[in-house]
């Protein structure tokens, strides 16, 4: 059986995000979902066990379950919450939790590391990202890596656009992409 994942929520002015942690760090961050914001609704990996703190749980129940969460994950969750709220406020985060990209390709990891270097309020094209990772003809593959990003917002795939500043796609939906860019002072 796989090591357990811990699923925790983060309440923001934009809704309740769902963060999923492994023993190595933040593995996924999911956008709020209408009517299901308090439960995990991302990609599942087999028969994993989970510790889940849903917002609908009572305070007493949540406090009891929080004690089951390893201290390292509680610290990572605090860093995730702080970074997420900073980005949503249009600021650069000072600290990130460790990111768990286990099972991802080296190409995807290279694209995501390059995305982490895009400052808040700035954008890059898929072509510019391909050049940044020394794969100038891999624009479409960069788009695929953006779509496969399991930690959107913190790994800012919303800052990557198609040529001529066209919005392109976004795993969280185009409304979220517009919203995130607007929060960073960018209007398209």
Language-model features: locations:
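Regulatory, non-catalytic segments
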Residues: 140-149
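Short Lys/Arg-enriched helix C-cap and helix-to-coil transition segments
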Residues: 153-160
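…primarily DNA-binding HTH/wHTH and HhH modules…
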Residues: 163-188
């Amino acid at each position: 059986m796989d090591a357990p994942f811990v699923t925790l929520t983060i309440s923001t002015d934009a809704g309740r995000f769902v963060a999923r942690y492994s023993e190595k760090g933040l593995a996924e961050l999911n956008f709020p979902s209408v009517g299901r914001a308090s439960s995990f609704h991302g990609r599942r990996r087999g028969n994993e066990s989970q510790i889940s703190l849903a917002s609908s749980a009572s305070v007493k129940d949540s406090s009891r379950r929080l004690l089951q969460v390893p201290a390292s994950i509680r610290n990572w969750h605090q860093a995730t919450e702080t970074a997420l709220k900073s980005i949503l406020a249009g600021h650069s985060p000072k600290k990130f939790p460790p990111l768990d990209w286990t099972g991802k390709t080296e190409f995807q990891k290279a694209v995501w590391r390059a995305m982490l270097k895009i400052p808040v309020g700035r954008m890059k094209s898929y072509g510019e990202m391909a050049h940044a990772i020394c794969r100038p003809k891999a624009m479409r593959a960069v788009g695929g890596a953006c779509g496969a990003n399991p930690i959107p917002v913190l790994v800012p795939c919303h800052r990557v656009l198609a040529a001529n500043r066209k919005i392109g796609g976004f795993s969280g939906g185009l409304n979220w992409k517009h919203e995130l860019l607007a929060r960073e002072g960018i209007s398209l």
